[in-house]
């Protein structure tokens, strides 16, 4: 299974430790195409050393999005890029799970929470210690489909 993980890069790296925990868990269920999002050495500037910069990153990530079977997005830290990825994935009718931590004091965009349709697009509020269990439950549900 190809898994596309979304998390903030240029929007802020405050949650990178949580991203690492999520990606480590996701690797039990398949290949995480975007595991670099969880790397602590990736700064808010993103992948500076990439030849052709933003265009290369966009095209590569869109290719990975097309290849993916499921999208898991940590959406607590607002990110234009993650929003773009989610909108694109929804247009492709991909299975999407968004994870949001209310304890952050932030509010999740209505464009994300309002997209919930009960099957393809899901949003789960969570506490950090619950993330592995939520992902296990989600992937068990996928295997029944």
From Swiss-Prot:
Q: Into which family does the record put it? A: Belongs to the 2'-deoxynucleoside 5'-phosphate N-hydrolase 1 family.
> This protein's superkingdom?
Eukaryota
Which Gene3D superfamilies does this chain map to?
3.40.50.450
Q: Which PANTHER family match?
A: 2'-DEOXYNUCLEOSIDE 5'-PHOSPHATE N-HYDROLASE 1 (PTHR15364:SF0)
Keywords (A to Z) from UniProt: Cytoplasm, Glycosidase, Hydrolase, Nucleotide metabolism, Nucleus, Phosphoprotein
Task: Name the principal localization, coarsely classed.
Answer: cytoplasm
The protein's enzyme class = hydrolase
- Listed name of the protein: 5-hydroxymethyl-dUMP N-hydrolase
Q: What EC designation does it have?
A: 3.2.2.-
Subcellular location(s): the record lists: Cytoplasm; Nucleus
Q: What does this protein do?
A: Part of a nucleotide salvage pathway that eliminates epigenetically modified 5-hydroxymethyl-dCMP (hmdCMP) in a two-step process entailing deamination to cytotoxic 5-hydroxymethyl-dUMP (hmdUMP), followed by its hydrolysis into 5-hydroxymethyluracil (hmU) and 2-deoxy-D-ribose 5-phosphate (deoxyribosephosphate). Catalyzes the second step in that pathway, the hydrolysis of the N-glycosidic bond in hmdUMP, degrading this cytotoxic nucleotide to avoid its genomic integration.
An example molecular function term from Gene Ontology annotations: 5-hydroxymethyl-dUMP N-hydrolase activity
Subunit relationships: Monomer and homodimer.
- Species of origin reads Esox lucius (Northern pike)
Biological process (GO) annotations held by this record are:
deoxyribonucleoside monophosphate catabolic process; nucleoside salvage; nucleotide metabolic process
Instruction: Give GO cellular component annotations, separated by semicolons.
Output: cytoplasm; nucleus
Which InterPro entries is this protein grouped with? 2'-dNMP_N-hydrolase, DNPH1, Nucleoside_deoxyribTrfase
Reaction(s) catalysed by this chain, per the record, are: 5-hydroxymethyl-dUMP + H2O = 5-hydroxymethyluracil + 2-deoxy-D-ribose 5-phosphate
Residue sites binding 5-hydroxymethyl-dUMP per the record = 7, 9-11, 79, 81, 85, 109
Pfam families per UniProt: Nuc_deoxyrib_tr
For this protein, the record's HAMAP family field holds: Nuc_phosphate_hydrolase (MF_03036)
